[in-house]
Amino acid sequence: MEMNFVPDATFYMRVRDESIGGDNPFRWDYKTSKEIFLHKRVVVFSLPGAFTPTCSTFQVPGFEKAYDEIRSLGIDEVYVISVNDAFVMRKWMIDQGVEHIKALPDGNGAFTEGMGMLVDKSNLGFGKRSWRYAMVVQDCLVEKMFVEDGKMDNCPGDPYGDTSPEMVLQYLKNVA
């Protein structure tokens, strides 16, 4: 996947819009992968699901903590992708106390499938989800890919290590 372009996909997000008023001042916003990644160098990490143990205990807090250091190494933004809808992703980011990393809800799994990372996790009652990966994207081109070992449908485990913020930081420091 390295040196290939990210797939064309649309992310469906809810954004606060004070002009709406009322108890739910949010509107739909649609961003394409091109709008998100063009003319930028970003870190993206993807995980099986919001509110899941490894994702909530290690991966999201780790990237949030490492945000400033990652940015200092020539990265414009840090994104988390999950095959969850915008409502779930927003609530999860609030629950996690995230202030810096940005959520990209891939509710239809289109981006994840285009990355070749969509797996079946029906053995856990999850349905189709993302395999855990991280990547550095430069101007829509995948510069570096980190993928957990053992990618397969209905994987009995949840490997984590190769896609940690520490691994991404190590790479960024080596190429800086």
Mark where each language-model region is.
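Chalcogenol-based redox active-site neighborhoods
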Residues: 1-176
